[in-house]
Structure formats: structure tokens, C-alpha cells
Design a protein with these regions (language model features):
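Conserved Class I S-adenosyl-L-methionine
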Residues: 116, 126-202
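Alpha/beta-hydrolase-fold catalytic nucleophile elbow
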Residues: 15, 59, 88-90
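Class I SAM-dependent methyltransferase SAM/SAH-binding core
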Residues: 1-46
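A short glycine-rich, Lys/Arg-flanked "PGG" loop and its adjoining helix->strand segment in the class I
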Residues: 69-86
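Residues at the starts of beta-strands that form the adenosine-phosphate
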Residues: 10-11, 84, 131
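Conserved class I S-adenosyl-L-methionine
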Residues: 83-116
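A short SAM/SAH-binding and catalytic strip from SAM-dependent methyltransferases
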Residues: 53-70
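Local beta-strand N-terminus motif with an aromatic residue
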Residues: 52-53, 82
């Protein structure tokens, strides 16, 4: 129970290349957490002293790191970690990654960097010999087939593009068939698979 912790407040640092994202995170941090510092930078360019942070976590935060920079980013993550680290990240089977790849193929001519996957992260941790444990969870995001506006907004957020509406997604020769398979028995169903990766230096 953090409210009974002997060390209060719990100082919290925020890191993101987007000032908007940092501001949004700052709004929801509540006691006993207290924002002590903010870093508007990428993880791979982040500079800190070795083992600065007792705990570091990245919850669905590493998708946009290019594949060729992912190892550097993870090394920075581990460099700053004094005790424990936690990464929650979708696998290649997850809707989030699959749909983004279809989006790149269907609307960007195949150009663009696919989201990084949990499998890539695990492979790098193995290569750099970092002890870790993994727990896989699966779940589904579902809503009525008639909830078109909600689904449109959700899919736009998945690809960070609000210029393409649901109708265009459904008519596209690549995203369309994929989305058709996400409708079953009058329900939209988006299957997710997430790897929870626990790292420790203890």
C-alpha cells in the first residue's frame, strides 16, 4: 500500500519525445506520486547517471522506436535501471501491430516503419544477456457493429491518422478484408496479445 510507504512522496520522472504526451501524463499523476523531472526526448537519446531509477516501466511505450534503434533504446532503459524494470508490449499477433502493418501497406504503399513487437524486444534482451521473465495475456476489445463512430476513432488512434475514415478503411483492398474478419455475430472484435516483461538486477 503506497499510502503507508515510509518514503513519500514517490518521485516520478516522465520521458517522451512529445511535450503533449508529457503534459497529458502529468495531469493524471496523483499522490503519493510526484513529478520530479521531465525529459522531452527519445529513450534512445536519453542521458542519465547509471542506475538512477529504482523502477523503470514502459507500458505500451516502445512501438514507434525504429527497429534499428531498439537495441540502443533498451540499453538506455537498462542503464538507468537500479533494481526493476517492466515493459508491457503487444506481440506480432496483436490487432494493434497487425492493423498498423495493413495500414502502411494499404494507404502508404508499404513505406513507413512498422511498430516494434514484443518478440523483437525479447530477442534483444536475449542478445544482450538481460535476465527477464515473461507473462503473456490475451484479451479482446469489442463493441457493437453499429458503433461506427467509436470504432472509427479507435482505429484512427491505432494508426495515428485521423484523415482516413472507417468507410475508406473498409473499402481499401488491404485493410478492408482484415476489418471484415474483425466482425462476428454483430460485434467488432479486436484480439490483442500482450507480453508483460519483468526485468530485475537483484
Amino acid at each position: 500500500n503506497l499510502s503507508n510507504a515510509k518514503i513519500l512522496p514517490v518521485e516520478y520522472s516522465l520521458l517522451d519525445p512529445s511535450s503533449f504526451s508529457i503534459a497529458e501524463a502529468r495531469k493524471v499523476i496523483q499522490s503519493p506520486f510526484k513529478t520530479s523531472s521531465e525529459f522531452e526526448t527519445t529513450l534512445q537519446e536519453f542521458s542519465c547517471e547509471r542506475e538512477t531509477y529504482d523502477i523503470i516501466w514502459a507500458t505500451h511505450a516502445l512501438y514507434a522506436i525504429p527497429k534499428n534503434e531498439l537495441k540502443k533504446a533498451l540499453k538506455r532503459f537498462i542503464f538507468g535501471m537500479a533494481r526493476s524494470g517492466f515493459i508491457a508490449h503487444a506481440s506480432e499477433k496483436s490487432h494493434y501491430l497487425r492493423f498498423y502493418r495493413h495500414y502502411l501497406d494499404g494507404f502508404k504503399g508499404g513505406s513507413g516503419e512498422p511498430y516494434s513487437s514484443a518478440e523483437q524486444i525479447l530477442q534483444i534482451l536475449k542478445e544482450i544477456d538481460i535476465p527477464h521473465k515473461v507473462k503473456k495475456i490475451t484479451y479482446e476489445n469489442g463493441v457493437s457493429e453499429t458503433a461506427s463512430l467509436q470504432v472509427e476513432g479507435y482505429l484512427q488512434r491505432c494508426v495515428f491518422d485521423d484523415t482516413i475514415d472507417l468507410e475508406k478503411m473498409l473499402k481499401n483492398s488491404i485493410t478492408g478484408p482484415y476489418l471484415d474478419n474483425c466482425i462476428k455475430d454483430g460485434q467488432w472484435c479486436f484480439k490483442q496479445e500482450v507480453m508483460m516483461i519483468f526485468l530485475s538486477k537483484d
